[in-house]
């Protein structure tokens, strides 16, 4: 009985293969090509582009460290600046990092709209760098007079990577100060208190004491 059932199963399988052999072969070929294509793309396009973008950005980083911000952004006529690196290699890790550099350069040279554009397009899984980018966005929005957006990004920076005590405490302090300046006194007081609670041994906590005292709140 069991042998007969096995024969039926084998016969059905053979019949299925005979009827759908072409379709199955096509599907398997597509899968193989997709896997092979991704491997080729990763190893023959992405990897070389990453290496090229790092090389291309070297001089721009050097100008950035020297505070030659226009050359860092736009190059020197021979070497690329961050803007060109982003244009040519924006999809690489180095191209992504160039957005952070460019955003800071634009911010420091007073081009706040372009600073926002580059910083919003920057994204990384590195919490330290992402928190710094959020803080720079807060600075840019503050310069543009968009206080609500600035406060949002300052708080986002403080909460994204609180282990970076200086940056997190300072970001939250900026949010508190801007809230106070915007007439949001209650929110400002809560933020000053939060700074003292979360970051007690920082300069931001000392500054918070001063501003709370101005509101007749003493601890």
Locate each region found by the language model.
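Short solvent-exposed coil/turn linkers within tandem alpha-helical repeat scaffolds
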Residues: 47, 86-95, 109, 123-131, ...
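N-terminal positive-inside, membrane-proximal cytosolic segments immediately preceding the first
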Residues: 1-32, 40
């Amino acid at each position: 009985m069991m042998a007969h059932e096995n024969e039926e199963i084998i016969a059905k399988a053979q019949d299925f293969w005979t009827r759908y052999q072409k379709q199955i072969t096509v599907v398997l070929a597509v899968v193989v090509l997709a896997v092979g294509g991704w491997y080729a793309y990763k190893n023959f396009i992405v990897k070389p582009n990453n290496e090229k973008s790092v090389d291309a950005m070297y001089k721009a980083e050097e100008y950035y460290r020297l505070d030659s911000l226009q050359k860092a952004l736009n190059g020197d006529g021979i070497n690329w600046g961050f803007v060109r690196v982003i244009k040519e290699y924006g999809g690489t890790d180095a191209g992504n990092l160039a957005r952070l550099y460019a955003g800071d350069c634009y911010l420091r040279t007073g081009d706040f709209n372009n600073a926002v554009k580059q910083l919003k397009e920057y994204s990384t899984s590195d919490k330290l760098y992402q928190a710094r980018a959020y803080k720079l966005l807060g600075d840019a929005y503050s310069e543009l007079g968009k206080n609500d957006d600035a406060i949002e990004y300052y708080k986002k920076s403080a909460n994204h990577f609180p282990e970076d005590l200086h940056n997190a405490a300072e970001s939250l302090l900026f949010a508190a100060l801007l809230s106070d300046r915007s007439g949001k006194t209650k929110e400002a007081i809560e933020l000053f208190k939060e700074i003292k609670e979360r970051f007690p041994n920082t300069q931001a906590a000392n500054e918070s004491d001063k501003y709370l005292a101005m509101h007749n709140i003493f601890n």
